[in-house]
Amino acid sequence: MLKRFLILLFIVKCSIANAQFNGALPTYKIQAGDNWVKAKNYYLLALLQQDKQAAKLISADEGLSGIGKNKLQALKSSLVDCKDGLCLPAALKFTDDEIKLVSDRLAALYRPGNALDRLVKTNLIPSGTYNFFGSDDPSALLVKAWQQDAFALNFAIGVYAEGKKPNYPLIDSISFDVRKKAYYTLMYDCSAEVAANTHNNALFFEPALNAALTYLEINERVDAGNFEPMATTVNKAAVDKIAGTKWGSFPYTHILVPGAGPDNLTTPLSGEGMLRCKAAARQYFAGKAPFIVVSGGNVHPYKTKFNEAVEMRKYLIAKLRLPASAVIIEPHARHTTTNLRNDARLAFRYGMPFNKPGLIVTDKSQNDFIMNMDKRCLKELNYVPYKLGKRLSETELEFFPLISALQIDADEPMDP
């Protein structure tokens, strides 16, 4: 009787957690396959490639296979017909009509219990990566996830092949001058590489997907995959420690330290970054939290080889004597908005209590900015990935992570 009661209680708790997180599960592991850049930017497409039954289903559809053949033929024709660099990548992008046709075909193919249904329910929903679209209608979620991935492919091709402006041109722009003759040669060679790497029976989206990944690589913009899988490598010691942490002994789950990039290419860690680490270390040693999350990517200046999170971790351990198992790196964020978003993702994936606050420790100026950052989040992310708590001092600010943070950002391929 007791055993039956405990099983029922477990099921109820799981159901409550499932509803609370819009279907996302903290135990879910991202199925990255052999390419984290692909999985983090275009998760539905990555899953379709990995799931043999789902791939078979969409390959057998005449409408979808027809689009794939047309895209591959357009790619091959562009190598003969295109006389300027911009013409070549344009052939690989999806048109609005193609996106709609794929949407219609996916909706028609979806059936309860089939491969697409299983993919949505066992991967898309528990991953939380498309939770902005809800989980009540799996068929609609599949279509919206496709539309987001198609937009993301077109965006990456537009910025890193056609030279269109990214959201932050000073740090995220294309690496090449589209006005120079060498640009045409480079684009031709990219298209030739994509054609050689895409077989005749490819899935309908693979020419565009291979192109986007190729353009990101030649621009040295594969930051999204750096240090992955973090939970089993650079953050393993901390992740292992989280499982046995007595959370009731601390007022906060962790301390978040946003990075501050230097203003030159030779300085690993800025003075501001050092000061933020010192302030965070004081709070750690005062027993405020069992972990410090240092957040920041390879951001400032343009094309820097130094990573903010990595350099802060080194400083905390070597200079401030924190145990390595207490420092978690979040090495991808490129803005303050994504410092908080990515931190929330790690807190969820690593199993920290989501109903307990974290503590931001930074300088007065940045905390002033964070206090009014919700509008910036809505503009750039379409959601706010946190809820603020009390401002304890000029340098300390409470916050609660929100599950919305798991949503992929389709127009930031270096940190989606």
Predicted segments with their positions:
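A structural signal for short, hydrophobic/glycine-enriched beta-strand patches
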Residues: Q20-P416
